[in-house]
A protein has these predicted regions:
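Helix-to-loop junctions at the C-terminal end of transmembrane segments
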Residues: 1-14, 101, 211-223, 307
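Cytoplasmic membrane-interface "Motif A"-like loop-to-helix N-cap segments
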Residues: 11-23, 220-232
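C-terminal ends and interior cores of transmembrane alpha-helices
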Residues: 24-38, 233-245
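Hydrophobic core of transmembrane alpha-helices in multi-pass small-molecule transporters
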Residues: 29, 40-58, 168, 249-263
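Cytoplasmic helix-loop-helix junction between adjacent transmembrane helices
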Residues: 47-88
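Symmetry-related core transmembrane helices of the 12-TM Major Facilitator Superfamily/SLC fold
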Residues: 114-132, 314-331
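Juxtamembrane intracellular "pre-TM" segments in multi-pass secondary transporters
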Residues: 136-166
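Short amphipathic helix-loop junctions that connect adjacent transmembrane helices
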Residues: 178-197
Length: 343
């Protein structure tokens, strides 16, 4: 769906309508869960599918609009700032629900959760209002980046193909935090209590946000070399988290995980901006999202299966895949530098 949405955005240049449609679907469906009955799991599933569809529709257009604005300050800074704000919202949302649950003690658990979903309509309305205001002030975001009067199809040039292979290897080896949380809760209760797990996740998200901004700034100065650094730094996290025997190694592993997550949310998108022509960039983001998502899904399934077989093997595969991405980053970077030199 992201490729279709991206190609549609490129062909029509209707970035705002596509972006707004996706946001509306995504933001309306979550508060609508408050209207689902106690046994209405089918309706809840339908709403969640619609929410995911909305996210898929909006993402290529959103990233493309950010990339246009990035031409003024730098792609790394722009996507790093986007991730910082995204993580701010990711922390603020659960905090809001925690406060609501803390003070709303009457009613059943189901009624309290329904009220929480309904309360999420407030930030949803604020978000849509801000989008409308931004749309009114900047109706043609493509003008931030002057170039390409006509649509130029995205070509599968060698540097982009090598880059996609690299990010697929990285995504395949990058474990989801849910597996980290499950492992800690099952086997590391003597190291860290279950009550601390949410705080550990919050710390990881904080590292994610800071790393995204930092690596974004570094990307604008040094280019894709920073991707190599981030891969080297984050690759050992699986050994520390799954094979470590102390709280110190666990915390260090989670910090490394946060660095890897922050890097992928800023540098990886910034590189797509620099590799794709303006007129077909949304298609490029769609291909990037599809490749990354499929690789992460397959990697999560494979590493989850290996978790029950051998932790050392699982950690080794995770680290190896992330490190195997480095040669592809370097090759892609060299080709990019050559193309700039001959441009």
């Amino acid at each position: 769906m992201r490729i279709v949405s991206g190609r549609l955005a490129d062909r029509t240049r209707k970035y705002w309508p596509i972006l707004m449609a996706g946001y509306c679907l995504e933001l309306i469906t979550i508060p609508a869960l408050a209207l689902v009955g106690e046994n209405g799991w089918i309706a809840a599933c339908v709403l969640l599918v619609i929410q995911k569809a909305g996210k898929a529709i909006k993402k290529p257009a959103t990233d493309t609009v950010v990339s246009f604005a990035a031409s003024q300050e730098g792609a790394g800074k722009a996507f790093g700032l986007q991730e910082l704000l995204d993580q701010f919202g990711a922390v603020l949302g659960p905090l809001l629900l925690y406060v609501i649950m803390l003070f709303k003690t009457e009613g059943s658990t189901f009624e309290r959760y329904s009220f929480c979903f309904l309360a999420l309509a407030v930030p949803a309305i604020i978000t849509l209002t801000l989008l409308i205001v931004t749309r009114c002030n900047f109706p043609n975001p493509e003008l931030f980046e002057p170039d390409a009067k006509e649509y130029v199809p995205l070509k599968a040039d060698k540097r982009f193909v090598l880059y996609i292979i690299g990010i697929c290897l990285f995504a395949f080896g990058f474990l989801d935090y849910s597996l980290v949380a499950m492992h800690v809760s099952r086997t590391a209760s003597d190291i860290i209590s279950a009550e601390v797990l949410p705080l550990l996740y919050s710390a990881a998200m904080l590292v994610d946000a800071v790393a995204a901004l930092l690596f974004g700034y570094l990307y604008d100065r040094w280019g894709m070399k920073v991707l190599v650094v981030s891969a080297i730094v984050s690759a050992p996290f699986s050994f520390l988290v799954f094979l470590g025997k102390s709280s110190l190694t666990l915390i260090a592993g989670v910090v490394m995980w946060g660095i890897g997550m922050g890097a992928q949310e800023s540098i990886l998108k910034a590189a797509v901006t620099d590799m794709t022509p303006k007129s077909s960039r949304a298609t490029g983001f769609g291909i990037f999202s599809l490749a990354f998502g499929v690789a992460w899904f397959l990697g999560s399934w494979t590493l989850g299966a290996l978790y029950d077989v051998n932790l050392t093997l699982m950690a080794s595969v995770s680290a190896a895949c992330q490190l195997l991405a480095i040669p592809f980053y370097i090759l892609s970077s060299n080709l990019m530098n050559k193309s700039r030199g001959t441009a």
